[in-house]
Amino acid sequence: MVILQQGDYVWMDLRSGQEFDVPIGAVVKLCDSGQIQVVDDEGNEHWISPQNATHIKPMHPTSVTGMMEDMIQHLGDLNEAGILRNLLIRYRDHLIYTYTGSILVAVNPYQLLSIYSPEHIRQYTNKKIGEMPPHIFAIADNCYFNMKRNSRDQCCIISGESGAGKTESTKLILQFLAAISGQHSWIEQQVLEATPILEAFGNAKTIRNDNSSRFGKYIDIHFNKRGAIEGARIEQYLLEKSRVCRQAPDERNYHVFYCMLEGMSEEQKKKLGLGQATDYNYLAMGNCITCEGREDSQEYANIRSAMKVLMFTDTENWEISKLLAAILHLGNLQYKDRTFENLDACEVLFSTALATAASLLEVNPPDLMNCLTSRTLITRGETVSTPLSREQALDVRDAFVKGIYGRLFVWIVDKINAAIYKPPSQEVKNPRRSIGLLDIFGFENFAVNSFEQLCINFANEHLQQFFVRHVFKLEQEEYDLESIDWLHIEFTDNQDALDMIANKPMNIISLIDEESKFPKGTDTTMLHKLNSQHRLNSNYIPPKYNHETQFGINHFAGVVYYESQG
């Protein structure tokens, strides 16, 4: 039996069984009228009858104040509800950083906060975790200090949903490391200037985030014996190439296209046959040309300036512009159905878009038309050409465009690495140390989820398992080894989902790969195999009806339905 008084704080558990439903904090306003009146943290009033009093539990004093800087050490209600309330109260007080052991939790404030100045960098330099309030600079300083003291490489994993602020956190860590490494060199400037280039070609506006990273990156920052930055190397993963050809409503293509059209001179645009963003199918598909808060023309100037710092020549910049323009013109090609020897075929209508695209790619228009409307096979020295239907030709055109952009992105990353990477010294007395920053796209769940979302969410499942292992599994194993009597923490382990997706025999990835190699493999046969193999797995959700084309996966962050068609 719980005895309550006016002003007591309680947990109110009115969960309806919906996803992410947790108890909510509340304060007792009235409890002497047979019913209990409470007001929850969102300002809503509730009347609780004596029969439902079991839904109310007293709140631990540490959760009442909700200002615990380290939740592992000081939070009494160490559960999902307690953690969320602590983060909420701190967030309302503009305290966006909170520790949970060695992990820093950051809540995106969606506004500029004056907590990243040179003075803040000075305050967090050479400080142990806990000496100062939680901050991204404290994590960066801890990595740097451990690298120098222990002469061991460090790694910082930045994880979270799309729009959580991962890219900004990466930039802040880079800013801190550049400031404290002891010298403001040209190489430090080059490392920092790589960011606007990568964002231009790899980021886009989505419904959740105006500057969403559509690729993953791992930045390895190299330090010499004195602790000064002497170079870096960038690895890129899983660029979302499909965005070049199609975007969801209220989303944009990659920033660089809009920046180029707004920032180029009229003379340059004329040479490339370019007009306005609304003129191009690849840019107008999402009905979102502008992005609030972004000045595309100014961003273009920033990109060009950064490219000069990273040693891109004027010739290379112009060749990049030609490829980007060619992509836009290819997206405006018009196709017409026709029949060839009783086979469905098509032709590309001759237009300015075709002529300009061919000119920019430095090929003859007829050759380009032929490549986009037929399939050529060479077997035993014999060449066989088969016409493509209009639908097939559109897919080929889009695949061609995605290939161009994907290879261009890889080349740009390689060009940046050529400027910022310095081979390690062969002298044993001067060992190189590094701090790695992993900035990878967050968990995604859109109206339509494709294979790219599956890959992204699979990567996030691995990160979640990393955190589960280090926060829960290893800690509890250590307690068990030392025979320490303690209350085991219940947690959700996502290892079964990982096994189903990619680890166990006949996993989802292997089945998709296998079906894509069969000459007669289709989206329908692939879905049938997935259903047959995994329908009894609790982490797999098969279609309810035969005509449905989606299957679901119960990820750690929620259920996501993937479209098998396309």
Swiss-Prot record:
It comes from Sus scrofa. Myosins are actin-based motor molecules with ATPase activity. Unconventional myosins serve in intracellular movements. Their highly divergent tails bind to membranous compartments, which are then moved relative to actin filaments. In the retina, plays an important role in the renewal of the outer photoreceptor disks. Plays an important role in the distribution and migration of retinal pigment epithelial (RPE) melanosomes and phagosomes, and in the regulation of opsin transport in retinal photoreceptors. Keywords: Actin-binding, ATP-binding, Cytoplasm, Cytoskeleton, Hearing, Motor protein, Myosin, Nucleotide-binding, Synapse. One of its GO terms (molecular function) is ATP binding. Residues 67-566 form the Myosin motor domain. CDD domains: MYSc_Myo7. This is Unconventional myosin-VIIa. Transmembrane segments: none annotated. The gene is MYO7A. Pfam families: Myosin_head (PF00063), Myosin_VII_N (PF24123).
